[in-house]
């Protein structure tokens, strides 16, 4: 998908341009598909929506909206969600709701910022931002990775290890002519 995936490639490009420095990856605001699935897997949860709220400097808050099964106790559900290692590193608040579907928005985003040094020149600042439909972009990146997989030796790869041109449809020569 896009993280890990294309975000890893962008982070690598930022580091290529400023090898010494620090990169902050700030997700959101938006729906985290992975965190929503993890919250829904908690006993007593009928449906869940986890929103990622950027707090800056690579830190995040999680707002988790849950539809409870009949008889489920909010305090137990909240404790189970907060104890999950997937949520443990972030400030997490759990809200009971009548309908998760009424709140659902498939939007998400990311803002990556790098401050670093290129050679001897300090104070380089880079910024990459996107606002997306989470499932649509995830699917697109997966299709591109599947395309690239046909051009790789057998094995397991991260998107960072695959030449970008292998992810694109079309003739490599034409792509180079158009993109360079």
Regions picked out by a protein language model, each given a short descriptive name:
Residues 10-12, 38, 62-63, 104-105, ...:
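Short amphipathic alpha-helical patches
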Residues 1-43:
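Glycine-/Pro-rich loop/turn segments that contact NAD(P) or position catalytic residues
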Residues 22-32, 79, 153-167:
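Short alpha-helical "patches" and their helix-cap loops
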Residues 25, 30-147:
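C-terminal substrate-binding/catalytic lobe of Rossmann-fold NAD(P)-dependent oxidoreductases
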Residues 123-180:
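NAD(P)-dependent Rossmann-like dehydrogenase/reductase catalytic/cofactor-binding core
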